[in-house]
C-alpha cells in the first residue's frame, strides 16, 4: 500500500500543475501596459459606434462616467434624462422607429432598479435594447460597497440574456454578443453589467487599490501579491484591440448578422391556397410585422397587395396610411366571429384577443410569429390554429404577396368578395358616424373628450410626418377610436404590458429619430405625472414634443368600473392641476413672467370657455416645436361613458 504513495503524490502534483496552467494560462501569456492612458469606457463606445448607435440615453452616475465621456468623443449623442425609466423608454422608441438596437446606460443599484418596469415593457413589446449598467468593483462585490446588489439575478427574468464583464478584455466580445442576442430570434432587452474598475484607467484603479510600496509584514506582502494579481488579471490584454481615435470608424469590432427564423415555402404555399379559397378573409397585423429585415414601407405594400380586409394593432397602426380602403378599425370582434379565414400576422391570443374567444371556431386560423410560445398561446383552451408558421412576420407577408401575385399566376387577379367588404364597410361607417355625433355634444361644464380628440385628428395632425405617442388609460383608449396615424411607424404605445409613463421617453426617442416630425403625446392626466419632467430634457436637447393632456382630475378607467362595482372611487381622484404650467416650467420658461404670454411659454389651458381656441393652440404648438420648444395643451375634459366596461382583467 505504501509503495503507491509516491505515485499518488506525483499524480496530484501533475494534476495541480495542469489545473493551475489551465486557470492561469490566459493571464500568463497576456501583456499589460501599465502606462496606458486607455480605459474600458473607450472600448464600450467603439462597440456602440460599430453597431451604428447614434444615441445613448442615460442618467449620469460615477459608475458609468467613462462610458458617457468616451461615447461623446465618438460623436454618439449622449442624451441625459430625468429618470432612468425614461432612458430605457427612449431607447425602446429608437429601436422601434430606426430598426436598430436602442441603448441606455445607468448607474449601479437604484439607477438600474429604476429601469425595471421599462425593461419589462421592452421585453413584452419585443424591442431590441442593450442596457449598460454600472456595478461595484469585483473585489468589493458582496462586501457592502455603495449601491452593490445582485443585479443579474434581479434582471435575469426580464432580459433575453444578462452578463457581467469581469475583465477589460471581455468588454468587446461580451458587448458584441449582447447586440447579436438583442436582435436575434424574438428581439428583446439584454443587460451587460460593468464593474466600475473595468471602465476606468489602470493608473486610477491601481491608486484606489492602495498597493503598498514597502510592505512590512507577510500579511501585507500577501495582500500586495493578491491585489497585483487581481489588477493584472483585470487589465491584461485589455487593449489588444486599440480604442479608436475620436470620430474614427472602429474596423476591428466584429458585427454579427442576427439569427432570424424564416417561414418555410411549404407553409406559405398552404397559406396561398387557403386565401384563394376564402370567402370572408381577414388579417390582423401587429407590431412584429414591422421588425427588420423587411422595411415597414415594403411590408405596407405587401399587405396592400393581398386586397383583403385588414385590422392593425400596436405599432402596426398607420401601416397603410390614413384612409386606405382595406383598413378597418371598428367592430373587429364582429368581423372575427364570422370570418372564414383569420390570419394573425404578429398578433397573439392574449387579453387583446380575449384569449382567442373572439375567433370563429369554424374558421381556418393561421398565425405567424417568431416566438413558438406565442404561436400557441391559449390554443389549448379557446382556439386552435389550422396553420402555425414560425418565422419573421414581415418576410412571411412578403413571400405571401409574391406567391399570390407572381408564383401562382392563376391567383394574381384574386379579389376579396365584395359582399364581405361591404358588410365590414357598413359597420365601419356606422361606428364612425356614432363617434362623430358623440363628439358634437358638449356638457355644461368642462369639455367633451371626444371633441378634443376630433380636433386633434383634423386640426392638429396636419402633416404626414406626425408621430403619435399614446400614454394613458381612458383618454388614450378613446383616442385609438378617433386618431388615424399617418403612415408606417407613426404610432407608439407601450404594448401588451399596458405601462403608464412611457410618454416622455417615447417622445424624446421619436423626435431624435425623426427631427422633422411633429411628435404628439396623448396623455391622460394620471399618466402625465410620470414623465412631465422630461420636458426639461426635451428643451435642453432641442427635441421637443407637444403634449395633449385629457385632464378629468381622475383615474377614470379604474374609477368608472370601481364605482359601479363597489360604490366607491377611493384612490381614484386627482386635482385639475395646471400641467401646462408645470411643463412650461420644466422646459425652462417662466409662464408667470408678465413680459411673456403664457402661450409663448408653451403652456395652453383649454376649458369650455375657450374651446374655440383649441385649433389655434395646436397650430401655435407646432410653431413652437419647429423652433425647438416643447409645449403642453392641458384640456379640462368631462367624465365620459364612451368606454364603459373597457377595463381588462
Curated annotation (Swiss-Prot):
Question: GO BP, one example?
Answer: L-valine biosynthetic process
One GO CC annotation, please? endoplasmic reticulum membrane
The cross-references to CDD domains, in alphabetical order and at most eight, read: TPP_BZL_OCoD_HPCL, TPP_PYR_POX_like
**Major place of residence:** endoplasmic reticulum
Binding residues annotated for thiamine diphosphate, in chain numbering: 84
- Catalytic activity entry: 2-hydroxyoctadecanoyl-CoA = heptadecanal + formyl-CoA; (2R)-hydroxyhexadecanoyl-CoA = pentadecanal + formyl-CoA
User: Which stretches does the entry tag as region Thiamine pyrophosphate binding?
Assistant: 474-554
- UniProt binding sites for Mg(2+): 525, 551
User: What detail does the entry give on cofactor binding?
Assistant: Binds 1 Mg(2+) ion per subunit. Binds 1 thiamine pyrophosphate per subunit.
Positions of transmembrane segments: 2-21
Q: Which domain of life is it from?
A: Eukaryota
Q: Which residues form the signal peptide?
A: none
Keywords noted in UniProt: Endoplasmic reticulum, Fatty acid metabolism, Lipid metabolism, Lyase, Magnesium, Membrane, Metal-binding, Thiamine pyrophosphate, Transmembrane, Transmembrane helix
Location of this chain's protein in the cell:
Endoplasmic reticulum membrane
Cofactors required = Mg(2+); thiamine diphosphate
Q: How does it sit in the membrane?
A: Single-pass membrane protein
| Family note | Belongs to the TPP enzyme family.
Protein task: Endoplasmic reticulum 2-OH acyl-CoA lyase involved in the cleavage (C1 removal) reaction in the fatty acid alpha-oxydation in a thiamine pyrophosphate (TPP)-dependent manner. Involved in the phytosphingosine degradation pathway.
Stated name of the protein = 2-hydroxyacyl-CoA lyase 2
Amino acid at each position: 500500500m505504501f509503495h503507491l504513495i509516491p505515485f499518488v503524490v506525483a499524480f496530484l502534483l501533475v494534476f495541480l500543475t495542469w489545473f493551475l496552467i489551465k486557470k492561469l494560462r490566459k493571464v500568463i501569456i497576456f501583456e499589460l501596459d501599465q502606462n496606458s492612458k486607455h480605459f474600458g469606457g473607450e472600448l464600450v463606445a467603439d462597440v456602440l459606434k460599430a453597431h451604428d448607435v447614434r444615441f445613448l440615453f442615460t442618467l449620469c452616475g460615477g459608475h458609468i462616467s467613462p462610458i458617457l465621456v468616451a461615447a461623446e468623443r465618438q460623436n454618439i449623442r449622449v442624451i441625459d434624462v430625468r429618470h432612468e425609466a425614461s432612458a430605457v423608454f427612449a431607447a425602446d422608441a429608437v429601436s422601434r422607429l430606426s430598426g436598430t438596437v436602442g441603448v441606455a446606460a445607468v448607474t449601479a443599484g437604484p439607477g438600474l432598479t429604476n429601469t425595471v418596469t421599462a425593461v419589462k415593457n421592452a421585453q413584452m413589446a419585443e424591442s431590441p435594447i442593450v442596457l449598460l449598467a454600472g456595478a461595484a468593483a469585483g473585489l468589493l462585490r458582496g462586501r457592502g460597497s455603495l449601491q452593490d446588489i445582485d443585479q443579474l439575478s434581479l434582471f435575469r427574468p426580464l432580459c433575453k440574456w444578462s452578463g457581467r464583464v469581469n475583465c477589460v478584455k471581455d468588454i468587446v466580445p461580451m458587448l458584441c454578443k449582447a447586440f447579436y442576442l438583442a436582435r436575434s430570434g424574438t428581439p428583446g432587452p439584454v443587460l451587460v453589467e460593468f464593474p466600475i474598475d473595468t471602465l476606468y484607467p489602470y493608473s486610477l484603479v491601481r491608486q484606489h487599490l492602495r498597493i503598498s510600496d514597502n510592505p512590512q509584514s507577510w500579511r501585507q506582502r500577501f495582500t500586495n501579491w493578491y491585489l497585483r494579481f487581481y489588477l493584472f488579471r483585470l487589465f491584461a490584454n485589455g487593449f489588444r484591440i486599440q480604442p479608436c481615435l475620436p470620430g474614427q470608424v472602429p474596423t476591428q469590432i466584429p458585427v454579427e448578422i442576427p439569427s432570424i427564423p424564416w417561414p418555410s415555402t411549404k407553409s406559405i404555399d398552404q397559406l396561398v391556397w387557403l386565401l384563394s379559397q376564402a370567402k370572408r378573409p381577414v388579417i390582423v397585423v401587429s407590431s412584429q410585422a414591422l421588425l427588420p429585415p423587411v422595411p415597414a414601407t415594403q411590408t405596407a405594400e405587401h399587405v396592400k397587395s393581398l386586397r383583403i380586409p385588414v385590422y392593425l394593432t400596436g405599432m402596426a397602426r398607420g401601416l397603410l396610411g390614413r384612409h386606405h380602403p382595406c383598413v378597418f378599425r371598428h367592430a373587429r370582434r364582429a368581423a372575427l366571429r364570422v370570418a372564414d379565414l383569420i390570419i394573425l400576422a404578429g398578433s397573439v391570443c392574449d387579453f387583446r384577443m380575449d384569449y382567442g374567444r373572439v375567433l370563429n371556431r369554424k374558421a381556418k386560423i393561421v398565425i405567424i410569429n417568431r416566438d413558438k410560445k406565442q404561436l400557441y398561446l391559449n390554443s389549448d383552451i379557446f382556439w386552435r390554429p389550422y396553420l402555425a408558421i414560425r418565422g419573421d412576420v414581415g418576410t412571411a407577408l412578403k413571400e405571401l404577396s409574391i406567391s399570390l401575385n407572381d408564383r401562382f399566376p392563376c391567383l394574381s387577379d384574386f379579389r376579396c368578395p365584395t359582399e364581405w367588404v361591404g358588410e365590414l364597410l357598413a359597420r365601419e361607417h356606422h361606428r364612425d358616424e356614432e363617434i362623430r355625433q358623440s363628439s358634437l355634444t358638449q356638457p355644461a361644464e368642462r369639455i367633451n373628450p371626444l371633441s378634443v380628440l376630433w380636433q386633434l385628428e383634423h386640426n392638429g395632425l396636419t402633416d404626414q410626418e406626425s408621430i403619435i405617442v399614446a400614454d394613458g388609460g381612458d383618454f388614450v383608449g378613446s383616442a385609438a377610436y378617433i386618431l388615424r396615424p399617418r403612415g408606417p411607424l407613426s404610432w407608439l404605445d407601450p404594448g401588451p404590458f399596458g405601462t403608464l409613463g412611457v410618454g416622455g421617453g417615447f417622445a424624446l426617442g421619436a423626435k431624435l429619430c425623426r427631427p422633422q416630425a411633429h411628435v404628439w403625446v396623448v396623455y391622460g392626466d394620471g399618466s402625465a405625472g410620470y414623465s412631465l419632467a422630461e420636458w426639461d430634457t426635451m428643451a435642453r436637447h432641442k427635441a421637443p414634443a407637444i403634449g395633449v393632456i385629457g385632464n378629468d382630475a381622475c383615474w377614470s378607467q379604474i374609477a368608472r368600473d370601481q364605482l359601479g362595482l363597489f360604490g366607491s372611487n377611493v384612490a381614484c381622484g386627482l386635482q385639475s392641476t395646471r400641467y401646462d404650467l408645470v411643463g412650461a416650467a420644466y422646459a425652462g420658461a417662466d409662464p408667470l413672467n408678465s413680459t411673456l404670454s403664457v402661450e409663448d411659454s408653451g403652456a395652453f389651458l383649454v376649458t369650455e370657455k375657450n374651446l374655440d381656441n383649441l385649433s389655434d393652440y395646436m397650430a401655435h404648438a407646432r410653431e413652437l416645436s419647429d423652433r425647438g420648444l416643447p409645449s403642453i395643451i392641458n384640456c379640462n375634459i368631462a367624465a365620459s361613458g364612451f368606454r364603459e366596461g373597457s377595463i381588462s382583467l
